[in-house]
């Protein structure tokens, strides 16, 4: 209704009256954007001069989980039901595709190497792997994070494992709780 009332496109560019905004300080930001502002709706207008479309950076991810109970679905609360791999596919704004596998390697050697079309990053334990995935997202700052059933399983599983087993909140810097992930009680 808002877009219709103010004749603003659902995608594209908008203008706002420059002096009629409030700049948000870093501590209060709701996103990972470099700049956030609060603008009254009456100070917004459709931009007809920019025809360029946005090319977002998109990350799609999936987790692979071990179940310690035979013929049973894994439970994040079970210590043995660990995440052993996180796969991520990145589509960069220039349309370049990058594939990364975050993997457990249960010996004392951490190393990275490339497969033909994917980079593999190995970690000694699940906590380090989840932290590596978090740091990857923080550095990349994707515009969109997508995946099959990530809201119904993957994200909640990662958060539960990290909070309960490792005592680290993977979302501390990702601000998931400020993007509608309220059911995870972060």
Model feature map: region roles:
Residues 1-186:
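The two-metal-ion catalytic cores of nucleic-acid processing enzymes
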């Amino acid at each position: 209704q808002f877009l219709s009332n103010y004749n603003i496109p659902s995608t594209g560019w908008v203008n706002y009256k420059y002096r009629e905004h409030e700049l948000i300080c870093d501590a209060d930001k709701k996103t990972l954007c470099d700049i956030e502002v609060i603008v009254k709706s009456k100070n917004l207008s459709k931009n007809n001069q920019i025809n360029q479309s946005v090319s977002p950076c998109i990350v799609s991810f999936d987790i692979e989980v071990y179940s310690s109970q035979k013929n049973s679905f894994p439970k994040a609360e079970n210590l043995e039901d660990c995440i052993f791999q996180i796969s991520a596919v990145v589509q960069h704004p220039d349309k370049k595709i990058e594939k990364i596998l975050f993997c457990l390697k249960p010996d004392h050697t951490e190393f990275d190497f490339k497969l033909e079309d994917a980079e593999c990053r190995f970690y000694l334990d699940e906590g380090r792997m989840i932290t590596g995935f978090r740091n990857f997202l923080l550095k990349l700052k994707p515009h969109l994070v997508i995946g099959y059933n990530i809201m119904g399983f993957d994200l909640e599983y990662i958060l539960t494992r990290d909070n309960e087993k490792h005592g680290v909140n993977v979302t501390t810097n990702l601000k998931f709780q400020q993007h509608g992930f309220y059911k995870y009680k972060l």
